[in-house]
Amino acid sequence: MKYLHTICLLFIFVARGNSRSCDFCHNIGKDCDGYEEECSSPEDVCGKVLLEISSASLSVRTVHKNCFSSSICKLGQFDVNIGHHSYIRGRINCCEKEPCEDQLFPGLPLSKPNGYYCPGAIGLFTKDSTEYEAICKGTQTKCINIVGHRYEPFPGDISYNLKGCVSSCPLLSLSNATFEQNRNYLEKVECKDAIRLASL
């Protein structure tokens, strides 16, 4: 069930834009074939995003080609340690001309716990999932908390939240509240210092 929620969440994060034309497709794996779609402001560039959920030795990757705003393009990549030996990672590449090149995933770093932790959570259809302790590793000294929603004709307003350890705070901007369909909106982006584990 956790993987089903995560895959659904990955598709939500990569929301479609609606006058530039870009390839538009989603798929499980490394590549996809789709169709050309006109973009609308503020989605003004074409992009390709690779997303991965890893848990222990198992991983699932998805690919998304779409219209994006330049602010999303600046993110470049992200790696979130959500706890329980699980990660959500993304590689974003935007381009002026198709096809956009890939940014490959390196192997997960063999990092050791660094003495810090963050609240960890991943939730779909909720903005307040049950938290657990995500043990930070390596250079992860920040806690990320992202809450947002995507409005669809059916089933309607899809809420989501994501919490975990990160190495640096992403430059993400909050979105204006709206009920326009097929759009992804960030309601909360918090990034704080990780919490030091109590000495035994």
UniProtKB/Swiss-Prot annotation:
Keyword Secreted found: yes
Glycosylated sites: N176
Subcellular location: Secreted
Disulfide bond residue pairs: C22-C46, C25-C32, C39-C67, C73-C94, C95-C100, C118-C143, C136-C165, C169-C191
Pfam families on file: PLA2_inh (PF02988), UPAR_LY6 (PF00021)
Tissue expression notes: Expressed by the liver.
Keywords: Disulfide bond, Glycoprotein, Phospholipase A2 inhibitor, Secreted, Signal
InterPro entries: CNF-like_PLA2_Inhibitor (IPR050918), LY6_UPA_recep-like (IPR016054), PLipase_A2-inh_b-type (IPR016338), PLipase_A2_inh_N (IPR004126), Snake_toxin-like_sf (IPR045860)
GO CC annotation: extracellular region
MF annotations from Gene Ontology: phospholipase A2 inhibitor activity
Family: Belongs to the CNF-like-inhibitor family.
Assembly: Occurs as a mixture of oligomers. Tetrameric arrangement appears to be the predominant quaternary structure.
Listed name of the protein: Phospholipase A2 inhibitor LNF1
Organism: Lachesis muta muta
